[in-house]
C-alpha cells in the first residue's frame, strides 16, 4: 500500500474514533444505564479533582507530585454516590413532576435547588470525611465553616445549569451533562477541603 493511502486510512480511522466512542457509550447507556453513569461520574469526578490540584499547584508554584489519594476519593465518590444516586433522582423527578404538569419547569428547579442540592452537598462533605479517615468532629467543623458558603456557591453556579439540564436535556444524558459541569464544581469543592 502506498504511504499516502495508508496515511489517509489512519486519518479516516482517527476521525471516526469519536463516532465509535459515542456509539459505544450510547450502547452501554442503553443496556447498563446505572453502571455507565456511575463510571462516567467517577472518571469525571476524579478529573475535577485533578483540575483542582493542577490549579492549586500552579498558583502556589508547588513542585510536589499530585495527591493520588484525592483522585481516588473523588473517583469513589462519583462511582458509588453521584452516578447511581443522580440516575435515580432524575428518574424520580421525571416521575414525580412530569413535563405536562403546570409549572413543571419551575417545580423541578425548586425541588432540585431546595432539596437535592443541600442533600447532595451534605452527602459530599460526609462521604469525603469518611474517605479521608477523619472523625465526626472534623465533619461537624467542616459543615459549620464550609456548608453554607458552598451551598450559596452551588445555587449561584448550578441553578441555570440545572434549569437547562432537568428541563431540556434528554433524561438519559442528564447525569453526563451534570458531570461535565461538575468538573469545575469539584475543583471548587476540592479547594474548600484544603
Swiss-Prot record:
Peroxisomal side, ranges: 52-74, 135-172
Report the function annotation for this chain.
Seems to be involved in pore-forming activity and may contribute to the unspecific permeability of the peroxisomal membrane.
Protein name as annotated: Peroxisomal membrane protein 2
Q: How does it sit in the membrane?
A: Multi-pass membrane protein
Keyword DNA-binding in the entry? The reply is no
UniProt entry tagged with the keyword RNA-binding: no
Q: Name one GO cellular component term.
A: protein-containing complex
* Record keywords, A-Z: Membrane, Peroxisome, Transmembrane, Transmembrane helix
Membrane-side (Cytoplasmic) residue stretches: 2-30, 96-113
Organismal lineage? Eukaryota, Metazoa, Chordata, Craniata, Vertebrata
Name the PANTHER family on file: PEROXISOMAL MEMBRANE PROTEIN 2, PEROXISOMAL MEMBRANE PROTEIN 2, PXMP2 MPV17
Q: Where are the transmembrane segments?
A: 31-51, 75-95, 114-134, 173-193
* Similarity field: Belongs to the peroxisomal membrane protein PXMP2/4 family.
| Entries under InterPro entries matching the protein | Mpv17_PMP22
Q: How does it assemble?
A: Interacts with PEX19 and SIVA1.
Amino acid at each position: 500500500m502506498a504511504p499516502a493511502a495508508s496515511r489517509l486510512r489512519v486519518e479516516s480511522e482517527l476521525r471516526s474514533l469519536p463516532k465509535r466512542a459515542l456509539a459505544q457509550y450510547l450502547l452501554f447507556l442503553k443496556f447498563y444505564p446505572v453502571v455507565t453513569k456511575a463510571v462516567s461520574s467517577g472518571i469525571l469526578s476524579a478529573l475535577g479533582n485533578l483540575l483542582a490540584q493542577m490549579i492549586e499547584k500552579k498558583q502556589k508554584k508547588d513542585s510536589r507530585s499530585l495527591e493520588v489519594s484525592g483522585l481516588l476519593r473523588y473517583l469513589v465518590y462519583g462511582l458509588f454516590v453521584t452516578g447511581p444516586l443522580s440516575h435515580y433522582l432524575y428518574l424520580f423527578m421525571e416521575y414525580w413532576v412530569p413535563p405536562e404538569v403546570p409549572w413543571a419547569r419551575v417545580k423541578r428547579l425548586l425541588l432540585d435547588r431546595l432539596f437535592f442540592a443541600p442533600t447532595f452537598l451534605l452527602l459530599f462533605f460526609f462521604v469525603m470525611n469518611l474517605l479521608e479517615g477523619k472523625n465526626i468532629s472534623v465533619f461537624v467543623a467542616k459543615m459549620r465553616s464550609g456548608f453554607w458558603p458552598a451551598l450559596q456557591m452551588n445555587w449561584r453556579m448550578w441553578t441555570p445549569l440545572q434549569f437547562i439540564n432537568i428541563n431540556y436535556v434528554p433524561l438519559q444524558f442528564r447525569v453526563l451533562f451534570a458531570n461535565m459541569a461538575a468538573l469545575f464544581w469539584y475543583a471548587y469543592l476540592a479547594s474548600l477541603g484544603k
